[in-house]
Each structure stands twice: as structure tokens, then as C-alpha cells.
Amino acid sequence: MMNRVVLVGRLTKDPELRYTPAGVAVATFTLAVNRTFTNQQGEREADFINCVVWRKPAENVANFLKKGSMAGVDGRVQTRNYEGNDGKRVYVTEIVAESVQFLEPRNSNGGGGNNYQSGNNNNNYNSGGNNFGQAPTNNGGFGQDQQQSQNQNYQSTNNDPFASDGKPIDISDDDLPF
């Protein structure tokens, strides 16, 4: 059986950090995730999903994310229950995050460019940057010095054969594959 959830959204409020009696950090936050379709008025609706993360990644989430920060969460769905003050059984369904990725630069709306992963019962975490498709760097994964020097040597070339041609493109419906 499989229980896997991957979400990308924005925090609806600052994360709440608490510690268990044993001293284990736990952070809770709510992620607003847009639906892939629009309603009858043409507006996108959002789902508000409760998430929980444990140990060192919980402290990092509390320190680096805030209301409005974009984050990616990889984890599993869990339902727990407890007896409420009125004596009735209360059920709570939430996402237990195994990995939280900060999807915005540190100087923007919030967060950092880090990816923190919590193991099942250990305190290991990875601090790599968002180096998608890039070779690893020796500066904690942030690659800013390298990126700045690459941008200085970059010259923009326009390889579009149809750019500024001025002539209309003659394509009939029979030429289209759909």
C-alpha cells in the first residue's frame, strides 16, 4: 500500500513551534494549495491543508518560513483522534511532512532556498539549495558566487528565425497535427 502526498502552496499564517515533554520540536502550519481547475466564476479555489513536521526540520520551518511563504511538502496523510473537552471523540487529518522545501529565496516574501528532510526517527537533515539540474557546489548549495560570474559572461542571442521578420506565417489548418 502507498501513502504519499506532495504539495506546493503558501503558508496561511506563521508556523507554530512547540516542544514535547521529551524536548522534541514539532511545528504545525497550514498550506493553501490552489486547485487545478476554476469555478463557474473563473476563479481558482484553494484547499487549506494542515501539516506537521518534527525535530530539526520543525525548528528550521519555524525560523525560515512565515505567512505567505511558498513551500513544497512531501509526506504522508495521518489521522489521529483524541477526546475533546466535551467528552466527544475528535478526529484530525493532517500531513506529516517528511521533507519541506523552501521554494523562495531568503530575501523575498519569506523562506530560504533550502530543503530540510526529516528521517523517521533521527535528527538528520539535508541543507542543499534549489540547484535543479546543476552540479553541486562547495558553498552549501547556494551557488550565488558562481551564478553571478556566469551571468556577467552571458550574452543574449536571439535564435528565433521568425523574430522581427515582419512577414505573416502561412499555416493552413491541414498543416496542424491536431
UniProtKB/Swiss-Prot annotation:
The gene is ssb1. One of its GO terms (molecular function) is single-stranded DNA binding. Residues 115-129, 144-160 have a biased composition (Low complexity). Gene3D superfamilies: Nucleic acid-binding proteins. Residues 2-104 form the SSB domain. GO terms for biological process: DNA recombination; DNA repair; DNA replication. A motif (Important for interaction with partner proteins) lies at residues 173-178. PANTHER family: SINGLE-STRANDED DNA-BINDING PROTEIN. Signal peptide: none annotated. Keywords: DNA damage, DNA recombination, DNA repair, DNA replication, DNA-binding. Plays an important role in DNA replication, recombination and repair. Binds to ssDNA and to an array of partner proteins to recruit them to their sites of action during DNA metabolism. InterPro entries: NA-bd_OB-fold (IPR012340), Primosome_PriB/ssb (IPR000424), ssDNA-bd (IPR011344). This is Single-stranded DNA-binding protein 1. One of its GO terms (cellular component) is nucleoid. Homotetramer. Residues 103-178 are annotated as: Disordered.
